[in-house]
A protein has these predicted regions:
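Primary recognition of N-terminal secretory signal peptides and signal-anchoring hydrophobic helices
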Residues: 2-199
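A short macromolecule-binding patch
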Residues: 207-214
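Short aromatic-glycine-enriched beta-strand elements
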Residues: 200-204
Length: 214
């Protein structure tokens, strides 16, 4: 009888250990952070000389800037719709016209800015404006990041102070909140991020102008 009870207890204990191990494995799989990295070109919807456009920290779907001869340009149509409708393109004379209170400014493909680069380009049926030209006549901030694998340009109309936060330990910035979401980039401890939105367990942040969740 004692041997039988010992056998039964051993079986029960073994089953409990197996069940516990299985439950632990399931929980580990469930909460193990994903190490999958996104395809940068697919995520930003830009490659080569294309430049991903962000407006007030939101990626603009279907709109891309262009990197031309070391400078970043924005499509005139988008600039007109989003930030400044006063840039007028004279199709007949292939020139840009901008009307100020006391003068009218003209520019064509031969007009260059302080950088020595053309203020506008005509390519693929689109008129492209140099970012410095846009900021010269528009109350916006423009930052360009053109040395990474995917080029990005950030156009902001808000001048409000930004909420900053320090990253306390090595972390991953993800596409969405949740450990199973794909990783955009790794962030070392003591890095600084801009907090766009504070959620219950995650924050929507910008790091070196890469939009993500942390």
């Amino acid at each position: 009888m004692k041997r039988f009870l010992a056998t039964v207890l051993t079986v029960i204990l073994t089953i409990m250990l197996v069940v516990g191990a299985a439950a632990g494995f399931i929980l580990y799989r469930k909460y193990k952070p994903s190490k999958e990295h996104v395809d940068q070109k697919e995520w930003y919807q830009a490659s080569g000389d294309e430049t991903a456009v962000f407006f007030n920290s939101e990626r603009v779907e279907g709109v891309q800037g262009r990197y031309i001869d070391g400078q970043t340009y924005l499509p005139l149509d988008w600039v007109n719709k989003a930030v400044n409708e006063k840039f007028y393109w004279d199709e007949e004379n292939s020139q840009l016209i901008y009307t100020l209170p006391d003068q009218i400014v003209y520019a064509n493909a031969e007009t260059v800015g302080n950088s020595g680069k053309p203020l506008l380009e005509q390519q693929d049926g689109t008129v492209w404006l140099l970012t410095s030209l846009v900021t010269a006549y528009t109350n916006v901030r423009i930052e360009t990041f053109d040395t990474d694998s995917v080029r990005r340009v950030f156009v902001d109309t808000s001048w409000d102070p930004q909420q900053l936060a320090d990253v306390k330990k090595n972390s991953a910035l993800r596409v969405r909140g949740g450990v199973k979401s794909a990783v955009i980039t790794e962030v070392p401890a003591d890095s600084e991020v801009i907090v766009l939105e504070q959620l219950e367990n995650w924050s929507r942040v910008l790091k070196a102008k890469k939009l993500s969740y942390h």
